[in-house]
Amino acid sequence: MQKSEGFRSKTRYKLQKHPRQKGMAPLTRALKCYTEGDRVHVVLDPSVQKGMPHPKFHGKTGVIVAQRGRSFLVRVKDGGKYKDIIARPQHLRESKL
């Protein structure tokens, strides 16, 4: 049988929660607002499928470029190029630096 290459393939451990973090995230995380120029980390929340960027961007740091509806446009460096990804606030964490 041919191997499946879906959107969430090879993410067995990447999209896994620890037992104490299981369930839905706090509502304030979904209502978080960012402004242009904010530095954010892309940390995927597997309990929310909407607005989830591709798993290869998990753990990357980027800059907010614009807001698109409820989502944000984040510029992330991937190899030697900059790529713009669209992600909801549930999958973003504010950078402390």
Curated annotation (Swiss-Prot):
Assigned GO CC terms: ribonucleoprotein complex; ribosome
Skewed-composition ranges (Basic residues): 9-21
Domain of life from the UniProt record: Archaea
GO biological-process terms attached to the record: translation
PROSITE patterns reported in the protein's UniProt record: RIBOSOMAL_L21E
Gene3D superfamilies per the UniProt record, alphabetical: Ribosomal protein L21
Name of this protein: Large ribosomal subunit protein eL21
Lineage: Archaea, Methanobacteriati, Methanobacteriota, Methanomada group, Methanococci
Native species: Methanococcus maripaludis (strain C5 / ATCC BAA-1333)
InterPro entries in alphabetical order: Ribosomal_eL21, Ribosomal_eL21_arc, Ribosomal_eL21_CS, Ribosomal_eL21_sf, Translation_prot_SH3-like_sf
Span list, region Disordered: 1-26
